[in-house]
Structure formats: C-alpha cells, structure tokens
Amino acid sequence: MKILVTGFDPFGGEAINPALEAIKKLPATIHGAEIKYIEVPTVFQKSADVLQQHIESFQPDAVLCIGQAGGRTGLTPERVAINQDDARIPDNEGNQPIDTPIRADGKAAYFSTLPIKAMVAAIHQAGLPASVSNTAGTFVCNHLMYQALYLVDKYCPNAKAGFMHIPFMMEQVVDKPNTAAMNLDDITRGIEAAIFAIVDFKDRSDLKRVGGATH
C-alpha cells in the first residue's frame, strides 16, 4: 500500500506550520505501507496543481492531507469538503476568492473516503485527543481536501482520500494566551496512529460510533 501525505507551508503570519514539520518526521513505512510526504503551498489552485502531479506520478492507494487549525485542542479528521472557496484572509499569493466554486464540474460536496472514526479511535489509543470534524472551513484546507477527492476520483478511482486538521505547535502559542497547542512529537505520533488506521481499514468499513455534533 502507498500513502501520499501532504503538509502546507506556513501561512497567516506564522513562521512555521505544524503540518509540514510533523510529516517531515514520519517514518518511511507505517504498518507496512510506503509513506511519501510532500509540501504544498498555501495557495488555492497551486496546492491542487502540486497534489495532482504527485497523484499522477505516485499512484497512491490513499491520500491524507494535513493542515493547521489553530485553536483546536486535538487532531480532527474531516468528514466533508464543500465545493466553495470563501477566503476570510488571502492565501500566500494574495488570492482571496469569495463564494467561488472550486470545480465547476464537481459535486456540491465530497465525503472523506478515509476511515475517520477508526482514525479517531487509533489516535485515542495513542493517548492523544481527537474527534471527527464536520467542517474543514472554506480556506485552502477545504479547497485541498475537495481537490484531493476530485482528483482521486479522476486519476486513482480505487484510492481513498481525506484531510485531518492538527493543533498549533507549542512554539506558536508563546504569545497567544489560553490557546490550545500540542508538542510536535505528539502531533507526529497522532498522524502515525491515523495512518495505521487507514492501513488497518483498507479492506473493511469504518467503525460505526458516535462522531457527530449537535451544532
């Protein structure tokens, strides 16, 4: 099994991005699966262009995109990506699309095809906080998740794809009082646990357990 893992470069005034720093620490194989990690720019269309190149060349069995969600307290596999860009801030090249479809020929939304409930359970078993997230936002993270599912559907129809948000690193919250953070080793360990679940559930259905929200 081959798994492509992506991480964004820093954005929004941050000097580092825990997504990129964490995936650099991943081992070459996890639970027998070959791991390839790539850096993607926090730029709407360019992120998808880079991803497409690697999907076509690597032909992964699964794609796991990782992104920073400052303020979240744990690792959060995303349930759904919507076909809409609505950027509160510009991306790293100044693009700020508002109410713009990501793909004119795409579905209104794509659900993650990764075993998100099993991923949460595996992260919990590693002793780390995690939960299913029901919104990936409307910035580049949602954009890339949507593009990943669209591109996999087009170029690797048997592959799975999805996205997971992670908290700030400790170094990022020194000047952000009362903001949740996690040390880099734990973030990496949580990503490894999630990937272990992706491999473990490659030929079976996801766990059926509560992961919803009331609001």
From Swiss-Prot:
Catalytic activity: Release of an N-terminal pyroglutamyl group from a polypeptide, the second amino acid generally not being Pro
Keyword Hydrolase: yes
EC number of the protein: 3.4.19.3
Catalytic residues (positions): 78, 141, 165
GO molecular function: pyroglutamyl-peptidase activity
Compartments, record wording: Cytoplasm
CDD domains linked: Peptidase_C15
Single Gene Ontology BP annotation: proteolysis
Description of how the protein assembles with itself and partners: Homotetramer.
NCBIfam families listed in its UniProt record: PRK13197.1, pyro_pdase
Family indicated by similarity: Belongs to the peptidase C15 family.
The name this protein goes by in its record: Pyrrolidone-carboxylate peptidase
Name of encoding gene: pcp
